[in-house]
Each structure stands twice: as structure tokens, then as C-alpha cells.
Amino acid sequence: ASFAEAPPGDKDVGGKIFKTKCAZCHTVZLGAGHKQGPNLNGLFGRQSGTTAGYSYSAANKNKAVLWABBTLYDYLLNPKKYIPGTKMVFPGLKKPQDRADLIAYLKHATA
């Protein structure tokens, strides 16, 4: 199912998902720096593999996806299927509600 068919996201629930599943490798605050994964500030509208100061896989750079609600929704289902060769080891979020909640949080936290 596509993002257009996704349930409404809850940013507060999404924040909890971020803390438990994403924060080990990612930061969202402006200038927070990179961890194992890149800082996600300014994520929406940015092309994959272009965050300054982070060493991306060739796969991530070459995919050249523009991050938006719909592309993140598909990516977060199964990152390694969406971008074969990505360094991201996270297996994905299978539940549409979890992905919608996380995206709602990211839209708020990375703006």
C-alpha cells in the first residue's frame, strides 16, 4: 500500500519509535552531527546520499531519491529492498501505522 493509503500519523508516537529504533544511529537536531547514520535535519526535499560530511554508500548516492512522505514510507518498509547496497542495517517497519507515525515525527523534528 502507498503513503496515500496510509493511516494518519501521530508525531508523539513517532517520536517514541524514533527513540527506540532510530536514535542509536541517527540525530535529527540541526548541527547535531552524524552517528553511524547521517543526521536527518532537513531530510524532506533532500536527495538521498547528499548530507554534507557523511560517507554514503554508492547505492544511496546513485539512487538519487528525493525524500518525501511517499518515498520515506516505501523506504522504511524495507530499506535494503528500496536501496540495494545501502549501509543502513535497519530491517524496516512492517506496520503502516508505525511508518506513518515515524514520518509525522520526522516532518516535525527535522524541519
From Swiss-Prot:
Disulfide bonds: none
Modified residues (N-acetylalanine): A1
Cellular component per GO, a single term: mitochondrial intermembrane space
Listed InterPro entries: Cyt_c-like_dom, Cyt_c-like_dom_sf, Cyt_c_1A/1B
Record bears the keyword Transcription regulation: no
Keywords: Acetylation, Electron transport, Heme, Iron, Metal-binding, Methylation, Mitochondrion, Respiratory chain, Transport
UniProt-recorded Gene Ontology molecular function terms: electron transfer activity; heme binding; metal ion binding
Localization of this protein: Mitochondrion intermembrane space
Chief location category: mitochondrion
Pfam families (alphabetical): Cytochrom_C
Sites of N6,N6,N6-trimethyllysine modification: K80, K94
Protein role: Electron carrier protein. The oxidized form of the cytochrome c heme group can accept an electron from the heme group of the cytochrome c1 subunit of cytochrome reductase. Cytochrome c then transfers this electron to the cytochrome oxidase complex, the final protein carrier in the mitochondrial electron-transport chain.
Protein name: Cytochrome c
UniProt source species: Pastinaca sativa (Wild parsnip)
